[in-house]
């Protein structure tokens, strides 16, 4: 009688499984290991047991932008295929601070900061995910009880040499930049999350690949079936050059007003539009391919940019808001003043134009105001302001900065 261990059953790759795999692979950077994941999908289809899909996010900031939703969109697609989505809030790992992509130690957050940020984190994510089909977990559930003994045992499962394979650690080590011991623990703790959750698939950005692979290795050591990993690209910002970031000002916040969100999305280049369609839209890829063919046939790209902007605004607000945002955008494009602009009352006339723009909330600083004047981007009652030394007399007028910022100003002495 053979003493060889029995091999795992092989499940058939049906059309349903092929469709699920195609949906999973849309817009991804890497899916590792694809053959393993196809078998996981096939087993799920054959047995009716949903896969456990994990996404861990550290609440390092209270607000998210549409760049963060790229991976959330993928989670929603997998959710719609019937799988269990685990939205993991890294309240414990936030105390360490993720060193991924860093050239210096990241300052850890306080417990108070983490709890404050986490309050709004899932509420915003739920604008993309199906709230009723999402399992919310906190990694402090299993990380805190580990204690010193458990942490030492976990640390013994990975070597310093393996940790130093990370490019960011290697650069810091070779450059003589300090690396704290607690930073070595971060990928181990993130990997242990996958063990605790028995994850079948873990998602993350391309900068998370090393951490995701650690989870796969730890599952093997703990005798679990290894998770597959799926990395999503980092979304380019409105400039189409650098990744979307609040610090770079090239972002669209998901809590922004519908008109602002719509206007920003309409400002992207025609080339970048296709990237946003692939990563942010839920439209089928064959439909998007049809849009491209229509443009090649002479259709105006603006028509499809409108569809993209409306879809995204409707997702985070409503369809009615998306329609109103389009009307507002068209009105502004014709040189009109929106109906819903804020009214501001200021004192101190005659007031320097830079101060007026700042106090009206149209720019963050007087230097930004002067830059806009230099670029011809400031208007009072439709007339372009070119004099940076202008003193504005008392009165009532509409002030405009750029294409989308307006205020109805009443200036008194």
Curated annotation (Swiss-Prot):
GO terms for cellular component: cytosol. Its main location: cytoplasm. One of its GO terms (molecular function) is RNA binding. It is found in: Cytoplasm. A motif ('KMSKS' region) lies at residues 243-247. Residues 351-411 form the S4 RNA-binding domain. Keywords: Aminoacyl-tRNA synthetase, ATP-binding, Cytoplasm, Ligase, Nucleotide-binding, Protein biosynthesis, RNA-binding. The keyword Transferase does not apply. Gene3D superfamilies: HUPs (3.40.50.620), RNA-binding S4 domain (3.10.290.10), Tyrosyl-Transfer RNA Synthetase (1.10.240.10). It is an enzyme of class 6 (ligase). SMART domains: S4. It holds the Pfam family S4. It catalyses: tRNA(Tyr) + L-tyrosine + ATP = L-tyrosyl-tRNA(Tyr) + AMP + diphosphate + H(+). Signal peptide: none annotated. ATP binds at residue 246. Its EC number is 6.1.1.1. Belongs to the class-I aminoacyl-tRNA synthetase family. TyrS type 2 subfamily. This is Tyrosine--tRNA ligase. The gene is tyrS.
């Amino acid at each position: 009688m053979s003493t060889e261990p029995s091999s795992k059953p092989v499940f058939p790759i049906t059309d349903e499984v092929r469709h699920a795999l195609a949906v999973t692979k849309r817009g991804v950077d890497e899916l590792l290991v694809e053959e393993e994941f196809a078998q996981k999908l096939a087993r799920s289809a054959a047995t009716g047991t949903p896969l456990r899909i994990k996404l861990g996010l550290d609440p390092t900031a209270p607000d998210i932008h549409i760049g963060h939703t790229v991976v959330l969109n993928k989670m929603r697609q997998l959710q719609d295929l019937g799988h269990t989505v685990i939205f993991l809030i890294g309240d414990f790992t936030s105390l360490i601070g993720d060193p991924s992509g860093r050239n210096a130690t990241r300052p850890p957050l306080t417990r108070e900061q983490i709890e404050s940020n986490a309050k709004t984190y899932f509420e915003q994510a739920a604008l993309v995910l199906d709230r009723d089909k999402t399992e919310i977990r906190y990694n402090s559930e299993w990380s805190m009880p580990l204690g010193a003994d458990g942490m030492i045992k976990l640390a013994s499962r990975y070597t310093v040499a393996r940790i130093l394979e990370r490019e960011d650690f290697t650069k810091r080590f070779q450059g003589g930049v300090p690396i704290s011991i607690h930073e070595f623990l971060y990928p181990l703790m993130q990997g242990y999350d996958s063990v605790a959750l028995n994850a079948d698939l873990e998602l993350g950005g391309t900068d998370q690949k090393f951490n995701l692979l650690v989870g796969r290795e730890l599952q093997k050591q703990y005798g679990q079936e290894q998770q597959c990993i799926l990395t999503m690209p980092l979304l380019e910002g409105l400039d189409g050059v650098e990744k979307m970031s609040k610090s770079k000002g090239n972002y669209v916040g998901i809590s922004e007003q519908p008109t602002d969100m719509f206007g920003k999305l309409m400002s992207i280049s025609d080339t970048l539009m296709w990237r946003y369609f692939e990563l942010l839209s839920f439209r089928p890829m064959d439909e998007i391919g049809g849009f491209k063919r229509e443009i090649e046939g002479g259709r105006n790209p603006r028509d499809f940019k409108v569809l993209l902007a409306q879809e995204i605004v409707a997702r985070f607000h409503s369809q009615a808001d998306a329609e109103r945002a389009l009307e507002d955008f068209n009105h502004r494009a014709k040189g009109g003043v929106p109906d819903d602009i804020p009214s501001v009352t200021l004192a101190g006339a005659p007031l320097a134009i830079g101060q007026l723009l700042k106090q009206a909330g149209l720019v963050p600083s007087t230097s930004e105001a002067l830059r806009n004047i230099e670029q011809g981007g400031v208007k009072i009652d439709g007339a372009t302001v070119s004099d940076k030394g202008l003193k504005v007399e008392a009165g009532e007028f509409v002030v405009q900065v750029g294409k989308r910022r307006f205020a109805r100003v009443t200036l008194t002495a």
